[in-house]
């Protein structure tokens, strides 16, 4: 069996993000009070692409925030003694705003729970929605995405990698086959 299998190429990623952008606009009836927040790391890059798509469609550049959830993780003590902390930058008031959280892969739901907790510490949004490029299943918390690029049923012996130009000099999604369960 192959160790890596491509499940989305660059064009499929682009089309999925364009579709998600349209769905966000349709569900929210436009851009009023709408903001995007990308979850560090790759969620930020996907959020920027959604922001660009919406700007092309509506002619409006949505506010875009960057959220690091490291200190909100429920497994922080298991990660390492000195976890890598990225920056959080949300330069707009989130109170009474419709926030679309953007992440690359939805798996157990724990990252999203941490992101919601981090946002709630910053204010009281009117609504929080979730957009993900890949939903791979295996939820451990009652969390679901409002916008999904692709549902990809996986086993616990697989990891989904979303590759983006900004970090990987590539745009595609691959599944890695492991020898053990995660």
Swiss-Prot record:
SUPFAM superfamilies: PRTase-like. Keywords: Glycosyltransferase, RNA-binding, Transcription, Transcription regulation, Transcription termination, Transferase. One of its GO terms (molecular function) is RNA binding. It catalyses: UMP + diphosphate = 5-phospho-alpha-D-ribose 1-diphosphate + uracil. Regulates transcriptional attenuation of the pyrimidine nucleotide (pyr) operon by binding in a uridine-dependent manner to specific sites on pyr mRNA. This disrupts an antiterminator hairpin in the RNA and favors formation of a downstream transcription terminator, leading to a reduced expression of downstream genes. Also displays a weak uracil phosphoribosyltransferase activity which is not physiologically significant. A motif (PRPP-binding) lies at residues 99-111. Homodimer and homohexamer; in equilibrium. One of its GO terms (biological process) is DNA-templated transcription termination. Disulfide bonds: none annotated. Its EC number is 2.4.2.9. The keyword Glycosyltransferase applies. Gene3D superfamilies: 3.40.50.2020. This is Bifunctional protein PyrR. The keyword Transcription applies. Belongs to the purine/pyrimidine phosphoribosyltransferase family. PyrR subfamily.
């Amino acid at each position: 069996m192959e160790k890596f299998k491509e499940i989305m190429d660059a064009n499929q990623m682009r089309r999925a993000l364009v579709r998600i952008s349209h769905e966000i606009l349709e569900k929210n009836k436009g851009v009023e009070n709408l903001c995007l927040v990308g979850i560090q790391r790759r969620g930020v890059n996907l959020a920027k692409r959604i922001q660009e798509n919406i700007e092309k469609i509506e002619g409006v550049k949505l506010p875009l925030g960057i959220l690091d959830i490291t200190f909100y993780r429920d497994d922080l003590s298991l990660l390492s003694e000195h976890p890598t902390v990225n920056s959080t930058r949300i330069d707009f008031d989130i109170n009474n705003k419709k926030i679309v959280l953007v992440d690359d892969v939805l798996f157990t739901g724990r990252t999203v729970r941490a992101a919601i907790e981090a946002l709630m510490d910053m204010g009281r949004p009117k609504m929080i929605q979730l957009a993900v490029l890949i939903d791979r299943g295996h939820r451990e918390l009652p969390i679901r995405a409002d916008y999904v690029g692709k549902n990809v049923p996986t086993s616990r012996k697989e990891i989904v990698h979303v590759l983006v130009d900004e970090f990987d000099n590539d745009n595609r999604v691959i599944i890695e086959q492991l020898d053990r369960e995660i």
